[in-house]
Amino acid sequence: MDIVSLAWASLMVVFTFSLSLVVWGRSGL
C-alpha cells in the first residue's frame, strides 16, 4: 500500500465519521 492510497483511505474515514457525527447531532441522538 502506497502513501496515496493510505491518505485517501484515511480521508474517507474522517469524512464519513464527521458526516455521521453531524447527522447524529441534527437528529438529537
Curated annotation (Swiss-Prot):
GO MF term set: electron transporter, transferring electrons within cytochrome b6/f complex of photosystem II activity
ATP-binding recorded as keyword: no
Main location: plastid
GO terms, biological process: cytochrome complex assembly; photosynthesis
Compartment annotation: Plastid, Chloroplast thylakoid membrane
GO cellular component: a single term: chloroplast thylakoid membrane
Transmembrane portions of the chain: 3-23
A Pfam family: PetN
Keyword Chloroplast: yes
Membrane topology of the entry: Single-pass membrane protein
UniProt keyword terms in alphabetical order: Chloroplast, Electron transport, Membrane, Photosynthesis, Plastid, Thylakoid, Transmembrane, Transmembrane helix, Transport
Cross-referenced HAMAP family: Cytb6_f_PetN (MF_00395)
Biological function: Component of the cytochrome b6-f complex, which mediates electron transfer between photosystem II (PSII) and photosystem I (PSI), cyclic electron flow around PSI, and state transitions.
Stated family: Belongs to the PetN family.
Complex formation: The 4 large subunits of the cytochrome b6-f complex are cytochrome b6, subunit IV (17 kDa polypeptide, PetD), cytochrome f and the Rieske protein, while the 4 small subunits are PetG, PetL, PetM and PetN. The complex functions as a dimer.
Protein name: Cytochrome b6-f complex subunit 8
Organism: Coffea arabica
Higher taxonomy: Eukaryota, Viridiplantae, Streptophyta, Embryophyta, Tracheophyta
